[in-house]
UniProtKB/Swiss-Prot annotation:
Effect of disrupting the coding gene: Mice display higher inflammatory responses in models of TLR-dependent peritonitis. Macrophages show enhanced responsiveness to TLR stimulation and a significant change in membrane fluidity and the global cellular lipid composition.
Cellular compartments annotated: Secreted; Cell membrane
A Gene Ontology cellular-component term: plasma membrane
Keyword entries, A-Z: Cell membrane, Disulfide bond, Glycoprotein, Glycosidase, GPI-anchor, Hydrolase, Immunity, Inflammatory response, Innate immunity, Lipid degradation, Lipid metabolism, Lipoprotein, Membrane, Metal-binding, Secreted, Signal, Zinc
Function of the protein: Lipid-modulating phosphodiesterase. Active on the surface of macrophages and dendritic cells and strongly influences macrophage lipid composition and membrane fluidity. Acts as a negative regulator of Toll-like receptor signaling. Has in vitro phosphodiesterase activity, but the physiological substrate is unknown. Lacks activity with phosphocholine-containing lipids, but can cleave CDP-choline, and can release phosphate from ATP and ADP (in vitro).
Name recorded for this polypeptide: Acid sphingomyelinase-like phosphodiesterase 3b
Modifications after synthesis and translation: N-glycosylated.
GO molecular function, one term: hydrolase activity, acting on glycosyl bonds
GO BP, sorted A to Z: inflammatory response; innate immune response; membrane lipid catabolic process; negative regulation of inflammatory response; negative regulation of innate immune response; negative regulation of toll-like receptor signaling pathway; sphingomyelin catabolic process
Organism: Mus musculus
Listed EC numbers: 3.1.4.-
Organism superkingdom: Eukaryota
Gene3D superfamilies in UniProt: 3.60.21.10
Enzyme class, UniProt record, top EC level: hydrolase
Length: 456
């Protein structure tokens, strides 16, 4: 595969220095192996369900999951933009949105293997930290808290990326921890199986600590603190709430609370959290009990353009996105991120995939870096400045949806970004819905630990 005829617009890197490194984060590739440009709108892609796909193109459609051509182009665009990243984060969801009976265990494993082989082909010498998504199992979502065939088979597929200890851990529960590459050896990546906490997972309902992952995570973070390491935490299903509707949480509440406790206790060694699942571009702030910002989670957009069927979400498609982070190799401090995207409509018309820069975080939100304090400032601006809110809203769908983010939209996004806990999220929805007055959102953002009912 070559890039002949491709138009990829490269961005100048904003930070210079010997300690600056870069890494890719990709998520939610969702390959639909049966995608075809058919004259019959009901035969284009199984992932569209019963919806007719009227204008399918070679690079995909907003009603469908990714054709192979789209995923292939995304990986080769990554190689063209930054061929030698320090490492790659890959946070899962590889299979299409189709019923369980349309897949099966063998098909799930075949898709994971196909995408694994593509990444190895394009980046043969790059370390990859990979997590399973809720669609990377059969039946989907039903991840067990103990060893099983899929964990064992995926561990074999990912064996070149795993140490002996990680290989054994993955087979037990699909989570592991690895040192970061490079001479400093001052950091590590923790890969979580948060599918164990998913509210749709009946296998772990009623368990206090599925697979003892929380206990293990606490031990890893405590050891990192003792050893002077900083940590990146990655996974697929994030805690908190979906920002494109109201009251849609992913974790069971008890697991959500436990995750928050871990972050609050160990936030000083966590240099960043990186998740997917939403297909959208957003972030989540974490605060201590005094209201001080202590950590941030980045939600990377998906490669799949698939329009979600989640109740309450209006026109929930997105353009395909890929993301690169700039970081300090010595401290793991995040300096910036750049999101690249494919305008799918344009690509299908031109029959050429033009991956281009969508935005650079420091420029978009007028902040010095991608640190916790900077992301808190970004949230403040999103909450209080309409033009920044609108800019964020367009980026949230990877420049697919250019409609105006009105009051109800603002409530959904600000409360979801600011409040990962169930109780404070509910309070935020109530307060913002009842009291949308100038300055009120800014007060809420600057004082996140306050209960809205106390400031009314």
């Amino acid at each position: 595969m070559t890039l002949l005829g491709w138009l990829i617009f490269l961005a100048p890197w904003g930070v210079a220095g010997a300690q600056l490194g870069r890494f890719w984060h990709i998520s939610d590739l969702h390959l639909d192996p049966n995608y075809t440009v058919s004259k019959d709108p009901l035969q284009v892609c199984p992932s569209a369900g019963s919806q007719p796909v009227l204008n399918a193109g070679p690079w995909g459609d907003y009603l469908c999951d990714s054709p192979w051509a789209l995923i292939n182009s995304s990986l080769y665009a990554m190689k063209e933009i930054e061929p030698k990243p320090d490492f790659i984060l890959w946070t899962g969801d590889d299979t299409p949105h189709v019923p369980n009976e349309s897949l099966g265990e063998a098909a799930v494993l075949a898709i994971v293997e196909r995408l694994t082989n593509l990444i190895k082909e394009v980046f043969p010498d790059t370390k990859v930290y990979a997590a399973l998504g809720n669609h990377d199992f059969h039946p989907k979502n039903q991840f067990p808290a103990q060893s099983n065939r899929i964990y064992n088979q995926v561990a074999e597929l990912w064996r070149p990326w795993l140490s002996n200890e990680s290989y054994a851990l993955f087979k037990r529960g699909a989570f592991y921890s690895e040192k970061l590459p490079g001479p400093s050896r001052a950091g590590r990546v923790v890969v979580l199986n948060t599918n164990l906490y998913y509210s749709n997972n009946e296998q772990t309902a009623g368990m206090a600590d599925p697979g003892e992952q929380f206990r293990w995570l606490g031990d890893v973070l405590s050891n990192a603190s003792r050893d002077g390491e900083m940590v990146y935490v990655i996974g697929h299903v994030p805690p908190g709430f979906f920002e494109k509707t109201q009251n849609k949480a992913w974790f069971r509440e008890s697991f959500n609370e436990e995750y928050l406790k871990v972050i609050q206790k160990h936030h000083r060694v966590i240099a960043g959290q990186f998740f997917g699942h939403h297909h959208t571009d957003s972030f989540r702030m974490f605060y201590d009990n005094t209201g001080a910002p202590i950590n941030v989670m980045f939600l990377t957009p998906g490669v799949t353009p698939w329009k979600t069927t989640l109740p309450g979400v209006v026109d929930g498609a997105n353009n395909p996105g890929i993301r690169i982070f700039e970081y300090d190799r010595a401290t793991l401090n995040l300096k910036d991120l750049v999101t690249y995207f494919l305008n799918l409509r344009q690509a299908n018309v031109q029959e050429t995939p033009r991956w281009e820069q969508e935005y650079r975080l420091t420029e978009a939100y007028q902040v010095p870096d991608a640190s916790v304090s900077s992301m808190h400032t970004a949230l403040t601006r999103i909450a209080s400045e309409p033009h920044i809110l609108q800019r964020y809203y367009v980026y949230n769908s990877v420049s697919y949806n250019h409609l105006t983010c009105e009051d109800s939209c603002r409530i959904e996004h600000v409360c979801a970004i600011q409040h990962v806990a169930f109780n404070t999220y509910a309070t935020c929805l109530h307060g913002l819905g009842a009291k949308l007055v100038p300055g009120f959102l800014l007060i809420l953002t600057l004082l996140p630990s306050l209960h809205v009912l106390e400031v009314l």
